C-alpha cells in the first residue's frame, strides 16, 4: 500500500490524495500550479483541491490568487480518527445489537479482514486463546497476545520457531506457512489460509462440533518446546 492508498483510507479520492502529497512537498499551490505539476486536468485539480478543503485536509490561503496549503498529516489523521470514534459511539448506542451467531459458518475473505477478525477474537476472549500460526505472522498479533497475558488470561501459541512472549506457553510444530487457526474460550474458532494479500479465505464459527474437532486437532499437533520442559495439556 502506497501513501496515496493510505490517504484514501482516510476518505480522500485518488486525485485528492495525490494533490495532498504534492501540497506537503511544495508548501502551498494555486489551482493552476497544482494541475500543472500533478498532470491532473485543471477542472479535476480544482475539484480535488476544493474536496481537500471540505474534508479538512487543506486550508485556503488568500493572496493575489487563491492558494491551498495542507493541514499537517498528524492533525488531519487525528481529526478523522476522533470524528470516527465519536460516530462509532453514536452508532453503537443507536443501532440494535447483532444477534449472536448460533453455530453458523461464516466465510471471511482477504488478509486484512481475516487479521481483523483474529484481533477481535483476541480482544473479546475472556479466559484463553490457542493460536496456531507461522512464526513470521505472529508478530502482528503480539500486542494483543501480550495484553491477554497481562490480564491473566491463558495464551498458548503453536508455531514453527521459538517466539518470545513472557507468560505465554509456546509449542513448536511443523506449521504450514499460509495456515492460521485460532480457538478462544473453547467457544469460537477461526481457521483459514493466507496465500497472499488478496487470495485469503477463512472460516469462522461458534459451532460446538467444529470447535471440538479443532481442539482435538491442535492438541494432537502440539509438541513441547524443548527448552521450557512443558507438559502437554489435557484440555484446551
Task: Indicate where each model-derived feature is located.
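Short, Lys/Arg-enriched N-terminal segment that forms or immediately precedes the first helix
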Residues: 1-9
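Short, cationic-aromatic polyanion-contact patches
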Residues: 8-14, 30, 62-82
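Short amphipathic alpha-helical interface segments
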Residues: 17-27
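A short acidic, leucine-rich amphipathic alpha-helix
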Residues: 33-36
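A short, conserved structural fragment
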Residues: 53-61
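PLD-like (HKD) phosphodiesterase/transphosphatidyltransferase domain
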Residues: 74-147, 156
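HKD (HxKxxxxD) catalytic microenvironment of the phospholipase D
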Residues: 169-218
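Conserved small/polar residues in nucleotide/adenosyl-binding loops
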Residues: 228-234
Amino acid at each position: 500500500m502506497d501513501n496515496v492508498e493510505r490517504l484514501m483510507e482516510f476518505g480522500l479520492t485518488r486525485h485528492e490524495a495525490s494533490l495532498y502529497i504534492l501540497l506537503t512537498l511544495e508548501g502551498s499551490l494555486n489551482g493552476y500550479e497544482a494541475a500543472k505539476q500533478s498532470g491532473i486536468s485543471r477542472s479535476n485539480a480544482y475539484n480535488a483541491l476544493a474536496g481537500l478543503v471540505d474534508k479538512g485536509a487543506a486550508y485556503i490561503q488568500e493572496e493575489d490568487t487563491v492558494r491551498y496549503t495542507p493541514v499537517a498529516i498528524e492533525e488531519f489523521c487525528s481529526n478523522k480518527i476522533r470524528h470516527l470514534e465519536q460516530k462509532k459511539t453514536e452508532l453503537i448506542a443507536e443501532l440494535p445489537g447483532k444477534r449472536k451467531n448460533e453455530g453458523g459458518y461464516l466465510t471471511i475473505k482477504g488478509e486484512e479482514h481475516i487479521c481483523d477478525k483474529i484481533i477481535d477474537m483476541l480482544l473479546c476472549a475472556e479466559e484463553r486463546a490457542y493460536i496456531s500460526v507461522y512464526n513470521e505472522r505472529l508478530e502482528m498479533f503480539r500486542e494483543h497476545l501480550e495484553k491477554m497475558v497481562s490480564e491473566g488470561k491463558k495464551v498458548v501459541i503453536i508455531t514453527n520457531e521459538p517466539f518470545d512472549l513472557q507468560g505465554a506457553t509456546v509449542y513448536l510444530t511443523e506449521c504450514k506457512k499460509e495456515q492460521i487457526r485460532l480457538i478462544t474460550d473453547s467457544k469460537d474458532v477461526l481457521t483459514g489460509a493466507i496465500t497472499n494479500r488478496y487470495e485469503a479465505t477463512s472460516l469462522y464459527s461458534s459451532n460446538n462440533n467444529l470447535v471440538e474437532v479443532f481442539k482435538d486437532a491442535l492438541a494432537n499437533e502440539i509438541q513441547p518446546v524443548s527448552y521450557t520442559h512443558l507438559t502437554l495439556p489435557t484440555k484446551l
